[in-house]
Amino acid sequence: MAVIKEKAECCTLLVDELYGQLPARVYATLFQRGKLSVRLISQFSKLSARQVKNGLCVLQQHNLLFYSVDANSGEAEYSVNHEYAYNLVRTGKILEMVDNSYGPAGRDVMQNLLLLGQTRISDLVAAYQAKINEVNNDDAWLNDKKPELAIKSKAQLNSVLCRLIEAELIDVIHSKTFQSAHEIEKQVHREVMDVYFSNGIKGTKAKIEFEQRVAEGLRKVREESKTLKRKLAQNGGASKRRKLAVGNETNGAPEEEEDLDPALDPRQVIRINYEKCIVELRSRRLVQYVNETLGETTGYVYGQLLKQLTKNISRCKSDPLIDALTPEEKVTPSVTTNEILDKVKTSIDLTLGIGKIPSKSISKSAAERLTPLAPKDKIPFMNQDDSDDDEEDGDYSDSDEEMDTKKENGDAPVARMSRPEQLRQHLLLLAEGHPGFVRHCGEDEWTVDFKPLMENLRATELDSIIEQTSGRQGLRLIRILRTKGKLGEQALQSLSLMRKVDLQQKMLEMRLVGFAHTQEVPRDNKADPKKSIFLWYCDTEQAYSSLIAKCYATMVHCLQVLEVRRQKDKDVLSLAKRTNVKGKEKDMMRDESYARFAKFLKDERLLMAEMMRIDDTLALLQDY
Amino acid sequence: MADRDKIQILKDALYEAARDHGSDQRLFTQRDLLDMQVIPQDNIGLLMQVIQILCDEKLFVGNTTASGLSWRWRSREDAKKYTSLPNSEIMMVYAMVDEAGADGIWNRTIKNKLNMADSLMKHCIKYLEQKGYIASMKNVEHPNKKMYIKANLRPSDRATGGPWFTEGELDTAFINELQEIVFDFIKQKSTYTSHGGGAGVPGVGAQGGGAQQREKNPKKGVVQGTIPHSEDISKGTKRSAGEISNDDTAAPAPAKKTRPGKPQLLPLPAGYKSYPTVSDIAKFIHHAGITNNTTLSEADIQQLVDVLYYDGLVEPVKVNGRKGYRVTRIPKQDPRTCNQRRLDHDPTKGGIVTSFMGVEPSASGLMEAPCGRCPVYDMCEEGGPVSPSNCVYFRRWLDGDEVQEQVISI
């Protein structure tokens, strides 16, 4: 488990920010030393064992730890679950996403789960029940302004939970949840060895079989958290109908709908499934991107398509160990035009967002061209076009002429299309050209190749960062290097149409930031620097990793600045915490204090928002 | 002596025959020369004599190639220049310059190749320059080298750097101007301008039904307001594409996404066949007569478009094997041309605009935070001389705008 320093710092500070100093100190120790028992933690962190246990308890509750019991000593050893710790920063985004797709009720449940950590369903139900009772008994007739509850009944809670579980946003905790991936893998290895290969593995064939069995075992472990979902799917007769109600629960979904949901096993412990949440966030990001490149109507269509498509995608990046060997799973899901059409709101005008031109100047065959196969893994950034599609072109242009002449006869210069056809226009636009948002994989079937698409988006993000640091000329030079490979200064100069002085200055600038690098190629054994050839090149992977580190570091800085501000305004903040002041700060505090208080809140909001925005970049670079 | 006369005649005949058979770049082998049927009975000895005389008179230039000796002819004027030179040193220097052709030759190269004393070579060059046979030139690739070229030749594109150079300097102003024009051209040709205009076409809703109704009787209220188009419509098919598209989109556009009255660029449907190609752009530039004293070849324009592509401003789209270009991030593009934007730009309103082409890069959180542009980022650490807690950039970022706000509120 290698974690870069910046990430470790960031996670520790996030824990500090959310759960206080004690857990943060324990966490920092774990980051520094790796897997530790309670005794060792207390030794290294100079905390008493009791304090350490308290800290661990909080961390465990929020799923921020892995633990395993050492077979020899019988002591539990703890290590950090840094992915989960980092995901804390996405809390806001996840809540917003749930709010958008499942309404405020869904968000409320999600929020409580985030606050509580993993929770037994019965506890959650009891807590809500208490709240509902409180409001109902609290002299409802006396107090007009009783707080509006997002969840009004147990049945509704149950139904919301069912929705979220079906969407995989919530999953179940099982015995292996608290083991690190590595630990689980080791265990599965051992089991497989014991059961099938007691005599050891001999030969390549056995090796392959061994790997398959391990992958199978791992998959089984992974599936365990989906038990509730499966159960729901089994008596899922109602789920079809229910889907119609999704999103409308705010306007009081009909009671009977809720009754149809099977009661969830109250003993199950649930938690938020970040993997799936990240899938949803990725879709959001993609839609944003389409909004920028092609327009909002197309972006909306794309959003609907992704919603359909990602229903059965549980994680953004497939595990090389588990998923490599299952070709049947690899068949990417696709959606048909009609499926999308069913979901598009009737209020959306699909004629918007695309220019209207006579169909004469559109080549139908080119637009409708099918690409049934996913693109091969090409070397990223090397010149990708011009390669494979030329031979087919000849055939197409012929049939094209025919089509055009036919079109001309019917004298409607601008084709007025039916709604499905309008929708198709958006999808075709998405499918055309770079960066391949959608692949038209069959007649009226659409799919998305996430891997190359995300690779392209990553490059775009890097480009925009380069453009902001080094200007458009810097971007130009980097993109030339990316497409052409290593280049000498002369070649670079003639390709970029830049003055030698400007070019050298720009390259130097980018060399310092780490976007570009030089390589020295000596002409002879003496390696005389005067005679050596110097080549410029850019290492994109390295640029990514340095950017990722920078993102973490910037978040750390934001949190540190926030802490400094908090210290500075300590007196005001402690005043605002007093129960008689809380909620009516403006009236109770002196003007000067209130101004400081408001300023602090503003700064806090700004810094938090900034962190979320940095997370946008970071997530794109490493998680999507 | 009859023999000598005969050789004289043969010499002239062979020279003329060689001239007829190719340019002064063509190399003739012995076989080629014999096949011209000038030398009687394929007499090799005679041919040798004739060629020797031609070479002496500088009318033929000998070459050694992989397949053996060969010759090419030289014009009589040039030959005369050679023969008029006083001594062989000067002749050799002139020959070197002559060989180098339009690329020119570096004086050090002449010196090294001829193994000549410095002073002697200088003397030769001076003589030749005075005579007006050679001239010094500048090469953009090696601006510090002293180069010479035959006086009656124009330096090659490689030496001058092609159309992008003026007097050995890269003409960035010219390039930039031209880029803007090309960019505007591509923008205009690859997008659709939706005038989110106010001309109300009532009830042109989203529903397919509405659209179909329009299809049936297009005379009703489809056309955008001010100018009466009805005659045009009755003519039916004769309308231009621009007009047609106007009446169709102008109305629905303001419904949701656009602020009324503001034109907006929209992408064209997939499979659009007329995205401008490089040759389209070259034609446009040629006809517009923007570059009246330089001719730009298609390759030059390609270079220009490539730079736009590397800048992330345009992207290639392939439709039926035809590689056209369109601008990127269409909805964000400003419908005005670069020049218009420059004129409209108010420098007092702050913000240094480096380019009027395209769109600002999309904002990223990292660059917005002070750390993204921090010059001392690498040494910033809590406890160090520069740390987040004493960071001036953060202070400015968080407090700076508040100071401004207060000023405004007063």
From Swiss-Prot, chain A:
InterPro entries, per database record: POLR3C_WHD, RNA_pol_III_RPC82-rel_HTH, RNA_pol_III_Rpc82_C, RPC3, WH-like_DNA-bd_sf
One Pfam family recorded for the sequence: RNA_pol_Rpc82
Composition-biased stretches (Acidic residues): 385-403
Entry GO MF terms: single-stranded DNA binding
Entry's localization field: Nucleus
UniProt-annotated stretches for the region Leucine-zipper: 551-572
Xref: Gene3D superfamilies: Winged helix-like DNA-binding domain superfamily/Winged helix DNA-binding domain
GO biological process assignments: DNA-templated transcription
Superkingdom per UniProt: Eukaryota
Segments of this protein annotated with the region Disordered: 229-260, 373-418
GO-annotated cellular components: RNA polymerase III complex
Keyword field: DNA-directed RNA polymerase, Nucleus, Transcription, Zinc
Record text on subunit structure and interactions: Component of the RNA polymerase III (Pol III) complex consisting of 17 subunits.
Function comment: DNA-dependent RNA polymerase catalyzes the transcription of DNA into RNA using the four ribonucleoside triphosphates as substrates. Specific core component of RNA polymerase III which synthesizes small RNAs, such as 5S rRNA and tRNAs.
Family assignment from sequence similarity: Belongs to the RNA polymerase beta chain family.
Record PANTHER family: DNA-DIRECTED RNA POLYMERASE III SUBUNIT RPC3, RNA POLYMERASE III DNA DIRECTED -RELATED
Protein name: DNA-directed RNA polymerase III subunit rpc-3
Organism whose genome encodes this protein: Neurospora crassa (strain ATCC 24698 / 74-OR23-1A / CBS 708.71 / DSM 1257 / FGSC 987)
Gene name per UniProt: rpc-82
